[in-house]
């Protein structure tokens, strides 16, 4: 299963224990393949630089990030760039369009996010959207 992941889900998994971290670990085990929009990777690094630059676990988080990126699939912006305007019109927050455009362009099996704008948008029929807990359950990886 190939799933596009958004920046907040990645950041949560890098810096905090919980379902998001379990999802990143599952990707390292090969239980699923995480798909990264180039815009999302850029956003993750920008947020780390801005908000986590003095976090006590920064080095460990950066090493974890490099591992999960290497285990996944990076989708270059040029592959989904033309789809961004169309998806921007379907979303309450146009800033979320690269995530959905990447899912569309890459043929991924869905998107994992905690972003309500993506989860609740009515214009995204055909693109499955999952909260992290739902996806872990679907994969048989949820905590009992």
Predicted features along the sequence, with ranges:
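Short secondary-structure boundary segments
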Residues: 38-39, 114-116
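Glycine-rich, phosphate-binding/catalytic loops in enzymes
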Residues: 20-23, 52, 128-130
